[in-house]
Amino acid sequence: MEEIQQEEKKHNGNDIFHIKEKIYEMILYGNPQLKDFPKAERYVLAGDIRKTMYTMLEMAVRLEKKYHKKTTLQDLDIEVDVLRNLLRLAKDPNLYPNQKPCLDFHTWEVWMRKVDEIGRMIGGY
């Protein structure tokens, strides 16, 4: 019984470490994209996206330290959904009809793949 608990703890710790690393990689990809946002959204929408990514990283660090992870995982899943919606808004051409979207389709697609992978990791936990 004790061996099973130790193996489970080891496995869960690795999963959280991988989630944290994926969030870190996403931040490294996303931050340079945010500086190219139009001035009108650079400090609002881009700031919200940046804040959400940093909140996700903070939650992943908290997950490493907690024994009971369910509520923190649920909160992290909510942040993933918030980020998905913020990125969707950033790529929407109707946000500013007379301007190009804050994110081009390719950048949005790559970023969303990273977010979706994190979401799948959380869901599989």
Please give the residue ranges for each predicted region.
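Amphipathic alpha-helical assembly/interaction segments
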Residues: 1-125
